[in-house]
Each structure stands twice: as C-alpha cells, then as structure tokens.
Amino acid sequence: MFDILMYLFENYVHSEVEFLVDEDELTKELTRAGFHQAEIIKALTWLEGLAELQEAGTPYLCNHDQQSFRIYTKDELERIDVESRGFLLFLEQIKVLSVETREMVIDRVMQLDESSLNLDDLKWVILMVLFNAPGHESAYEQMEDLIFEQPDGRLHS
C-alpha cells in the first residue's frame, strides 16, 4: 500500500500533473502500473481518511494545548521507532509540524498496513499530510527542503 501512496504522490501530486479524480480511472491506471487491486483499495481508503481529517469535528484536533507533551500508546511505540518519534518532536520544535498536523501524521502512520516504519517512510507521510492540510504551505515547503536538500549528517540531535 505504501508503494502506491508513494507512486501517486510522486507521479501526480509532487510533479504537479493533473490528478485523476475518477476513482475507477485511477484504479485502472494503478493496475496498469502493476499494483494489485486489494492494495489499491487500501491506498485509496488511506487517502480518503487523510481527507476526512480536514473536517472540523475530528476530536483530537480540537481544544489542544500547544505546550502539551505527546505520550505515545503501546501500538504507536511499536510502529513508530525512537528515531522517528525524535524527528516528529524536532519538527514540532522548529514549527514545521503543529500539534494538529503531528496528530494527523500519527493517525495516518497507524492506518498504514506496515508493521513498522522507517524514518524515510515517515518523512513521506509527513509530506503527504502537510500537502493536504490547508494553510500549511510554508511547513510543506520546509519539509520538502529537509527531505530533498538534506545536508550530510543528522538533522537533529
């Protein structure tokens, strides 16, 4: 499923090619690209879930304290390794992620069918979330810079 999300992001969203909005056409395109039907459905469902997070009624996106500290659940700790959690914290500290977008990222990570996620995969999920979050264009651009113009060495300590 993650491969399909990457394919869609790289070939449509990131390349600024007109995105196919017809789900049947998109499914046919992905099938021609070699993806399996079941994985295509999972990826499209994941994207629909991302779009639904934009709705104002999402409970964990309301009434938050900007000074709060995130405690991860057992399942989140198993899926998101220490390095990735540190990177999320780093992005919050430099204001690339807000409390809301961090929670959206964690929500989308937990909905992937991967048992664990590496830092590079997490970065792509963050890009997808920021791209789809209205009003976060600057954060998206900063994240792009962190990914594509990454200096040698670690980004955070």
From Swiss-Prot:
Disulfide bonding pattern of the chain: none
Transmembrane stretches, start-end: none
Family: Belongs to the Smg family.
NCBIfam families, alphabetized: PRK03430.1 (NF002897)
PANTHER family (alphabetical): PROTEIN SMG
The name this protein goes by in its record: Protein Smg homolog
Originating organism: Shewanella piezotolerans (strain WP3 / JCM 13877)
